């Protein structure tokens, strides 16, 4: 093989989020295809792609060179930033490069990105090789300006601190000033004896990628391509040129090429990957192993005392627990992980001691008895047949991984504690990268190309919003996409460009829960990335790379449900304390509570963790779970595999005796499998059962059985053939018929693909059960906590309020005196609406209200509140929202008066504030009036009509709280439905049609598996609810009426709904209230007295009727005086459409009682 003549030493990947385009693997692949012996990736101030690059490079036979590009500042150039490329020659250089990058982020940065001081290079120079940055470096800029003195100073710096390690970089990519700089640099090199080096400043792989690269940069910078102000800093020549191309380009400066190879030879960094480096846990004089044994045995004593209060039973059960604990401890210590368990134990115990709610465990870690003894988990693994080997397998060495759930509100407190304990420079969170996803990349590319918003929006909306959606998947899922792609050249060009950019790294963020704890400084293992203020450090390696680099990851996950449980418990225990009861311990509730399972079997699981979706409620209704094992199964069954395979139907039929229980199949079963499969009625549901079957039938160790489970999941033919043979041999040794063994193996293999981790299912089922139990026993506190958690989502709060009403709970409007930011429960067991859930009222105004209330007591009225609070925080707009929501109902006569008095109250408050300010500075001590002395009087006005009140509630709360819009229609609706309310309805006889009416509170259109569309809407008339189904013909005709908050009159057949336990109607005819009036009303009656009638009233009456004269309903005027009553029928040209607007206008003009519709 001939000696290489050139190596690329300056290349950006897409981790250079400003301008890189290609991912590390394609860059390495291209370099290998070009026959390059080595490659440097020098992303801008980061090593984010290093681990992937290092692995890909060695895999392709290419030497990876570690480096980074920097913005540099120095006193000589003032505020001007220059470029510098830094390569690591050895491991010391790699360490110094890591420190440079980390310091650049930790100092904070602005729009230009992180910056290093040139002086930092003095201390951190060892093991580093510098490329000067070409025309953008400090020497390059000084040369182009002809400032020889500055050139001399710069060169002197590098000669002093980087002898033989500073290279003048030469670039020929056709950009302005490159050649001028190059000639000056070559002359300088000859004059000062400086080495030169050639680079191509690579930004993309092929020259054809230039347009995509320009769009990528324009997306980042916020320009359109045709914007004349857009910076044009790149050229089509910045691709990965071949050795031949570079040699031809620099044929006149051969030493610049030779030096690339020389530098590549000098760069020899070894990155330690695949090892584990745990921090040292403090254990005093004991070894880590002995300390773990001690703490585990002590913990098991406490657990056994709780599990088996009866000493005789405890003595009887102890041996199996002792034996399991001993086995697990041996494996943990032999595998070198005692410190890991102790670290997790410590921060979980700290959390519990400091009021931070912790989950009972999740994932396979719940299968460890040691974890249970150390109180890392809260589920007895022996009781539920959870396997340790599913978590930590001695036959497959890998790091244990506890996923720990914490209360969302307090999780950061735990991270702070860990940082305090192990040192802030040894603890960090983990980076995560956002990429250009399908929907967003279409919008971004469309904007940069200058397409109109509507054009881009039409394409983007065709891409399904599913997580993980790609353009390729979207083309399969949405038939319109390929159609418009083929039909429209502009669409095709946009999508083709979007495909080139899809998946490119766009930005960096913080992983939701990943935390690493290092034995020394984090920067000994990975560089840091910080926010613009230099805070919140995260490792530059993502979650998989950081583990591969040797740091141990701990998952501190935030689970909203734990926050809900915590809030509920705070309210519950406050009430229990008042009643002299001990606090409720949610971990000690019985797992066989009848009230809870009765509620579960009724599918009343709205707001219950994991069990609230419609599909899950359907499954619950069919399964009728009556024990905790059934709840564990629910979590495992409600997944696409089991649902689509028929497993769920088999499970339900076996539970209810409609199918014979066999272990596992009627034809092929073995009695030894009964203990394994009995909890799931003979169905192979869990991964642990796969392992146990292999152990029982074929003598596998549980570690070996875990390997079998993994092999079945991967479905590799050669591995499965090997496992089949091992399974057969083991079964034969156990005296099991060969054919039976192979048939069972086939069944196990089939179901292994659907199998779920029982440890995870059990742990999450426990959280589900806790929320179910709280809902059953403390419904008000639980629902208040759930609504608080969803305060920012008005639509969810509306649904939860609905559930509260269904449960018979009373909800009071928000109240300025008794209300809090959150929903809470008062002493009467009523839920008080959270002020924080009012739209348009932020946290600041509420804090101002509560602060003033705590300081001066309850507010007496509106004027008092305005005088005592900071009206800069509590402005007019906020006060209007509070009035409309009902929060001031107890402070004034009615909402209309409060609203009309608001200006006076604010003016009085302003005057009071000015007077108080003057009074405080008055040398004679003449103070302003106290708030109670302020003269106040409410505006005299009529109360708002009920509909205006309700509309205000709807605007601010998202729902009607103190009334119902249907109230004003009830008398009228009776005419349409024959007086039958929804609560009085019953199934109709076959062929018989009944009419119902109500307010639409929910409406949707769904598509069945056969592709048929069905409309479903829920009617509410305050007496009850009715679900109405509209099948194809009816839906086509009436879909336009299926809108929330519309009053509908529906005729159809009523039947019993097996799912909800209520009634449902199949609609034949649907009308809104306006259509019903047109059909059934015989006239519009207007009653006036002689005292009311005058020319002005008649003129206004005419103005009200005029816009509605296109209808069919005659108008009748009833005139009343003391001695007579007359009826006047308006002419045919005055027939009207009796809409809500007309009726409300007339009632507002002459009074509600004097306007009504007439019927036969």
From Swiss-Prot:
Enzyme class: transferase
GO cellular component: cytoplasm
EC number: 2.7.7.7
Catalytic function, reaction form: DNA(n) + a 2'-deoxyribonucleoside 5'-triphosphate = DNA(n+1) + diphosphate
Keywords from the named record: Cytoplasm, DNA replication, DNA-directed DNA polymerase, Nucleotidyltransferase, Transferase
Localization (cell): Cytoplasm
InterPro entries: DNA_pol3_alpha_NTPase_dom, DNA_pol3_alpha_thumb_dom, DNA_pol3_finger, DNA_pol_IIIA_C, DnaE2/DnaE/PolC, DNAPol_HHH, NA-bd_OB-fold, NA-bd_OB_tRNA
Any single biological process term in GO: DNA replication
Signal peptide: none
GO MF, one example: nucleic acid binding
One protein family per Pfam: tRNA_anti-codon
SUPFAM superfamilies (alphabetical): PHP domain-like (SSF89550)
Keyword field contains Thylakoid: no
CDD domains registered for this protein in UniProt: DnaE_OBF, PHP_PolIIIA_DnaE1
Record Gene3D superfamilies: 1.10.150.870, Bacterial DNA polymerase III alpha subunit, thumb domain (1.10.10.1600), Metal-dependent hydrolases (3.20.20.140), Nucleic acid-binding proteins (2.40.50.140)
Subunit structure: The DNA polymerase holoenzyme is a complex that contains 10 different types of subunits. These subunits are organized into 3 functionally essential subassemblies: the pol III core, the beta sliding clamp processivity factor and the clamp-loading complex. The pol III core (subunits alpha,epsilon and theta) contains the polymerase and the 3'-5' exonuclease proofreading activities. The polymerase is tethered to the template via the sliding clamp processivity factor.
Protein family per UniProt: Belongs to the DNA polymerase type-C family. DnaE subfamily.
Function field: DNA polymerase III is a complex, multichain enzyme responsible for most of the replicative synthesis in bacteria. This DNA polymerase also exhibits 3' to 5' exonuclease activity. The alpha chain is the DNA polymerase.
Record-given protein name: DNA polymerase III subunit alpha
